[in-house]
Amino acid sequence: MILKANCKINLGLDILRRRADGFHDLETVMFPVAGLYDEVEVVRTAAPGAEFRAEGLAVDCAPGENICLKAFRLMQRHYGVDGVAIRLGKRVPFGA
């Protein structure tokens, strides 16, 4: 499976409240940017766990703490998903 995570411009952002989990509830208006995206490829494998590989621009986070692996761990915990290879083609600059 290959997904395109489109870039978007935040036109408005309102922080509503801080939640008990430390995150915030937000209200936002975003505008998609055509043709600028990160590409995420997920392939099932026979090996347990997740293999992660990033290509393109630098991924600015600690190893094992990127959002792709966090999503995998949630799917693993809640749905028993196991054995995947994840490739992130990073085209959108971090924080953009």
Task: Place the predicted regions along the sequence by residue.
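ATP-binding N-lobe of GHMP and related small-molecule kinases
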Residues: 1-94
